[in-house]
């Protein structure tokens, strides 16, 4: 199981998600361009000393990420407010990549079209969306509940 962030623009959210990935032994991907540098103080504070523990790959562009992903044959599951099905009703596989869009705009039409599934976390009508770090935690929790953790923890 892996988490990918498409052009993230809020450093605190990205740091929090990378900390989550480190704690759960889940690989992480940042698809550039990000809206901040990894030296950003708020990014480092949110990730704390866990950033050195995460298996992080930075991809220079969407096309390079997509070439890498297709080469391995991994499914791409996009979490979006425009999802076609609930994330709770989906059957996850251990090699899936859970993709989250940019906080300010989501993903491009090209990314939307490339997704093998578009999933939504149902929320109360009239509200826009969850914080992306909270959405990532909920999504990876359900995916790992179904598939089991990547590593056995004591």
Where are these regions (language model features)?
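Post-transcriptional modification and biogenesis factors for structured RNAs
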Residues: 1-154
């Amino acid at each position: 199981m892996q988490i990918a962030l498409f052009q993230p623009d809020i450093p605190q959210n990205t740091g929090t998600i990378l900390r989550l990935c480190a704690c759960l032994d889940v690989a992480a991907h940042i698809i550039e361009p990000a809206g901040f540098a990894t030296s950003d103080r708020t990014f480092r504070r949110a990730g704390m000393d866990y950033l050195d523990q995460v298996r992080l790959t930075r991809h220079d562009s969407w096309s390079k990420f997509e070439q890498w992903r297709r080469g391995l044959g991994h499914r791409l599951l996009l979490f979006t407010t425009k999802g076609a099905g609930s994330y709770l009703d989906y059957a996850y596989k251990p090699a899936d990549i859970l993709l989250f869009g940019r906080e300010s705009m989501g993903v491009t039409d090209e990314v939307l079209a490339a997704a093998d599934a578009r999933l939504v976390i149902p929320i109360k009508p009239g509200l826009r969306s969850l914080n992306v770090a909270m959405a990532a935690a909920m999504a990876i929790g359900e995916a790992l509940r179904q598939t089991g953790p990547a590593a056995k923890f004591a």
